[in-house]
Amino acid sequence: MDPLEQPDQARWNARYATGDAPSFTPHPLAVAALGLGLPAGPVLDLACGPSGSALAAAEAGRRVTAVDVSDVALRLLAAEAARRGLGGLVSPVHGDLAVWRPAPASYALVLCTGYWDTAVFGAAAQATLPGGVLAWQAFTQAARLDRPQLPPDWCLRPGEPASLLPADYDVLVDKPTDRERGRMRQLLARRVAARSAD
């Protein structure tokens, strides 16, 4: 049995195998992050699904590591990357974010949209290069008013995720998304090389 075979993988595999074909439209947060003047280096897309954001980063010349628990989503992404001539830039990684961790200080951009786990966020913050950007969007507790089946731990608490950033980050954007009526919150933050001793 696949060591990752578990309820999350089965649920997402079923969704991607039977749902509509992915649009591969990049997430607006990814588009914003890619336009921020990133340092040299690769991009990490966490809980990526069949990610148009990973493709947009590759089209901008970035190497991309795209991690997801769904092997079906990763096959769709890999096929689209190959169709666009980007197969050499997009590296799908079949991983469960509950245990998979990126190397520290390795990525110019770390992106995650639609997933929340405080430990994963902490590892992502450490994986961002100095000068690089951490881009995150996740459900807030308010989302549970419409979707009570969402576990509380999958939703941001007040002040998160910005309140969990290490001290070597500057917050660029921290706001609820208009589209979700405050049911989601997004963050863009840049890791600085060093703080002055003022």
Listing of model-derived features with the role each one plays in the protein:
Residues 70-72:
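Conserved SAM/SAH-binding beta-strand->alpha-helix loop
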Residues 1-38, 41-49:
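Conserved class I S-adenosyl-L-methionine
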Residues 102-109:
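A short acidic, Gly/Pro-enriched loop at the edge of an enzyme's catalytic core
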Residues 85-97:
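Conserved SAM-binding strand-loop segment of SAM-dependent methyltransferases
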Residues 132-139:
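Conserved beta-strand signature within the Rossmann-like core of class I S-adenosyl-L-methionine
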Residues 116-125:
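A short, conserved alpha-helix within the catalytic core of class I
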Residues 50-60:
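Conserved SAM-binding loop of SAM-dependent methyltransferases across substrates and taxa
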